[in-house]
Amino acid sequence: MLVTAYLAFVVLLASCLGLELSRCRAKPSGRACSNPSFLRFQLDFYQVYFLALAADWLQAPYLYKLYQHYHFLEAQIAILYVCGLASTVLFGLVASSLVDWLGRKKSCVLFSLTYSLCCLTKLSRDYFVLLVGRALGGLSTALLFSAFEAWYIHEHLERHDFPTEWIPATFARAAFWNHVLAVAAGVAAEAVACWMGLGPVAPFVAAIPLLALAGALALHNWGENYDRQRAFSRTCAGGLRCLLSDRRVLLLGTIQALFESVIFIFVFLWTPVLDPHGAPLGIIFSSFMAASLLGSSLYRIATSKRYHLQPMHLLSLAVLIVVFSLFMLTFSTSPGQESPVESFIAFLLIELACGLYFPSMSFLRRKVIPETEQAGVLNWFRVPLHLLACLGLLVLHDSDRKTGTRNMFSICSAVMVMALLAVVGLFTVVRHDAELRVPSPTGEPYTPEL
């Protein structure tokens, strides 16, 4: 398993580098890329945002392993994960309104503080302290995915008055470097935990200086901005009306809830499947992120003017790949007949599918959901998404250890078949909808929204 992991990592990394180098050679520089004021503004944003992302990714490979290291049972670990997901649901519902009221800059600094406290709780072996840490992690995750983007968009439009068309360029670059940071974070986690022999708590301690630096830079370099015009209740009510009045939005939300709930369960299960076979967890995680980056690169190539595939087609392909991978996992995790290499390949395929899924879903959401209602609609998407993931982990909590993992993959397979049916339903509704198609390339090359 050790050799397989390193070999897969090298092959995936080489594939990603090859695709990115060919893209860089072919990509012309635009006006936004050469504007000094815009580049300085981007740098101010990226310095803080990338440090926050790096700290987040650094903790991912060894979370389950840390709880195992503290001798908690799988059922107890499942409850810790459920606590984190439930916290994400609760704080995610009010995060946008809280950030708008408190201030985006203050919210980013608050993220650094709460996530640092979350990391510090990992030094304790007390179960209650770890539960509190998971709750803090849920709050931090909600702030990470709301405060930073809200701050950037407001500053971009209101303070600097840059063109709206330049916003996707910033987030497309951020999406690419997010993958790169994730790959590097996996290697760094492996280095501090295993190569340096510091144990599974080391990545969490190493994340604290990154979070402190991110908070300090935001406090020193960023201006404050607010948006106190819209109440949380009005945001949710408007989102619910949009969700119920447009079948496309309802189907898209169903696909997102089903697909991403399975991904949450996958995040919990991959470590107990591979770790008993001597897998280097940091390198495995980096391989996953490289596979996801490869999927994103393939999405960009597929939607380019040369191939001109549509995001709806790639969304369908992503769901199909995950269905196939989960069926593989139901066989590769059979008690007494485990095949860790086959399971690893299935996990890589799931991550490749995620690389296709997220830009496709992002494109379709932006086209289907009115901009003013996106926050409210996404709140309603998050509730079933996290509830499904929590239910799945609770089912695993009550299962027999030997068969529970395989049963969980079987349930996930059934959930993804339902997602596939929802994709077919959405495809039927939107097949003649020109609004949801990438426009034919004329003049300037198309840059997909990531």
Swiss-Prot record:
UniProt keyword Transferase present: no
Keywords: Cell membrane, Ion transport, Membrane, Transmembrane, Transmembrane helix, Transport
Superkingdom per UniProt: Eukaryota
UniProt GO BP: monoatomic ion transport
Membrane topology: Multi-pass membrane protein
Full protein name: Molybdate-anion transporter
InterPro entries with a match to the protein in the record: MFS_trans_sf, MOT2/MFSD5
Transmembrane feature ranges: 1-21, 43-63, 79-99, 128-148, 176-196, 198-218, 249-269, 278-298, 311-331, 344-364, 376-396, 409-429
Record's subcellular location: Cell membrane
GO molecular function, one term: molybdate ion transmembrane transporter activity
Annotated Gene Ontology cellular component terms: plasma membrane
Pfam families associated with the record: MFS_5
Function: Mediates high-affinity intracellular uptake of the rare oligo-element molybdenum.
Family: Belongs to the major facilitator superfamily.
